[in-house]
């Protein structure tokens, strides 16, 4: 369906949990262990109900996020049941990759088509520094297993000043021999991210163009989503840029979000929305739930205002919202 600005909203991002098995520095406090109690999370049946009603009004693609979605029990059955919904054309997962390698075959067999894996460095010591408790080899193993099982892979990378800027060329080489899309995501001022200085994607692109032959005269192509892509001569995969801060893409936004507690967010930045979990637990019918979702989608704001200090800003951390 369309929102009031005429954008076609066909993509649902739904967070299964705020829990994570890493503590990435720009996402979560080092010693954080105060997560949402299980009885406040949407149940898997509630999640499935939301997906069904969203599908009935035009949602075609579902992405499961977190926190780390793979720490949520029952995810295989959830994907299996979402895959049975006729209107849903694609099920995707955003993950840190630590647990994925040993699960991807089963996930794929039950309907998972794509994964986005967060990876900011190829150096073990830096990986430990940024994630605080992670192991790089597990992520690289997960990428390998995804390719073996024909699950399409995108790698999401955040470049931080004075941390991994010198690895840009090494990181894009992941897309050289493999059909992997690597996307540079500009750091957004959410939660712990406000404490770091990111690098703009225009600067990253200039670094790449100095060393690689960018095809199509360096012009970028926006596909179905916020990323603009370039092709590099000899590369099997593409390089993408998600530039939320320097190149607002809100006019093409096609998504709606639901947090682990069932709060439907119309925009990542804005705090407004409606709690679907509470409505369901109060006994509303499927038709009533559908109408609430339709109204929420229709009222989606025109754009974010990350660069402004707004009273309407969502103060929660990214892992609480759904990354």
Swiss-Prot record:
Keywords for the protein's UniProt record, in alphabetical order: 4Fe-4S, GTP-binding, Iron, Iron-sulfur, Lyase, Metal-binding, Molybdenum cofactor biosynthesis, Nucleotide-binding, S-adenosyl-L-methionine
Gene3D superfamilies in UniProt: Aldolase class I (3.20.20.70)
Cofactor binding note from Swiss-Prot or TrEMBL: Binds 2 [4Fe-4S] clusters. Binds 1 [4Fe-4S] cluster coordinated with 3 cysteines and an exchangeable S-adenosyl-L-methionine and 1 [4Fe-4S] cluster coordinated with 3 cysteines and the GTP-derived substrate.
Kindly tell me the pathway this chain contributes to. Answer: Cofactor biosynthesis; molybdopterin biosynthesis
Q: Give binding positions for [4Fe-4S] cluster 1.
A: 20, 24, 27
Q: Which terms does the UniProt entry file under GO BP?
A: Mo-molybdopterin cofactor biosynthetic process
Fetch the Pfam families from UniProt.
Fer4_12, Mob_synth_C, Radical_SAM
Could you say which residues bind GTP here?
13, 63, 94, 154, 255-257
CDD domains cross-referenced by the UniProt entry: Radical_SAM, Twitch_MoaA
List ligand-binding residues for [4Fe-4S] cluster 2.
250, 253, 267
Q: According to its UniProt record, which reaction does this protein catalyse?
A: GTP + AH2 + S-adenosyl-L-methionine = (8S)-3',8-cyclo-7,8-dihydroguanosine 5'-triphosphate + 5'-deoxyadenosine + L-methionine + A + H(+)
Question: Where is the Radical SAM core domain positioned along the sequence?
Answer: 4-233
Give a GO molecular function annotation for the protein.
Answer: 4 iron, 4 sulfur cluster binding
Binding of S-adenosyl-L-methionine: at which residues? 26, 67, 118, 188
Q: Which cofactor does it need?
A: [4Fe-4S] cluster
Entry keyword annotation includes Oxidoreductase: no
What's its top-level EC category? lyase
Q: Give the E.C. number(s).
A: 4.1.99.22
What family name appears in the similarity comment?
A: Belongs to the radical SAM superfamily. MoaA family.
Q: What does this protein do?
A: Catalyzes the cyclization of GTP to (8S)-3',8-cyclo-7,8-dihydroguanosine 5'-triphosphate.
Q: What is the protein's quaternary organization?
A: Monomer and homodimer.
Spell out the protein name for this chain: GTP 3',8-cyclase
Taxonomic classification: Bacteria, Bacillati, Bacillota, Clostridia, Eubacteriales
């Amino acid at each position: 369906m369309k929102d009031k600005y005429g954008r076609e909203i066909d993509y649902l991002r739904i967070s299964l949990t705020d829990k994570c098995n890493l503590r990435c520095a720009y996402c979560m406090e080092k010693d954080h262990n105060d997560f949402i109690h299980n009885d406040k999370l949407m149940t898997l049946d509630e999640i499935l109900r939301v997906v069904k009603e969203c599908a009935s009004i035009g949602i075609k693609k579902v992405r499961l996020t977190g926190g780390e979605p793979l720490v949520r029990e029952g995810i295989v059955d959830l994907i299996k049941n979402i895959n049975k919904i006729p209107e849903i054309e694609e099920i995707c997962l955003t993950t840190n990759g630590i647990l994925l390698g040993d699960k991807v075959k089963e996930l794929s067999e039950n309907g998972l088509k794509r994964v986005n894996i967060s990876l900011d460095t190829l150096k073990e010591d830096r990986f430990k520094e940024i994630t605080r408790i992670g192991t790089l080899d597990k992520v690289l193993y997960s990428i390998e297993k995804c390719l073996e099982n024909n699950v399409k892979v995108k790698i999401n990378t955040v470049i931080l000043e004075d941390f991994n800027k010198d690895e840009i060329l090494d990181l894009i080489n992941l897309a050289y021999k493999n059909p992997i899309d690597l996307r540079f995501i500009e750091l957004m001022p959410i939660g712990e991210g406000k404490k770091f200085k990111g690098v703009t994607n225009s600067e990253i692109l200039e670094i790449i163009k100095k060393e690689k032959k960018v095809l199509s005269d360096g012009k970028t192509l926006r596909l179905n989503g916020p990323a603009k892509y370039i092709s590099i001569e000899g590369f099997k995969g593409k390089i993408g840029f998600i530039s939320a801060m320097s190149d607002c893409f809100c006019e093409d936004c096609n998504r709606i979000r639901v947090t682990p507690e069932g709060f439907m967010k119309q925009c990542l930045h804005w705090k407004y929305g409606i709690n679907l979990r509470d409505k369901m637990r109060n006994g509303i019918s499927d038709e009533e739930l559908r109408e609430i979702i339709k109204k929420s989608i229709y009222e989606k704001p025109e754009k974010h205002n990350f660069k402004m200090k707004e009273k309407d800003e969502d103060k929660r951390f990214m892992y609480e919202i759904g990354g």
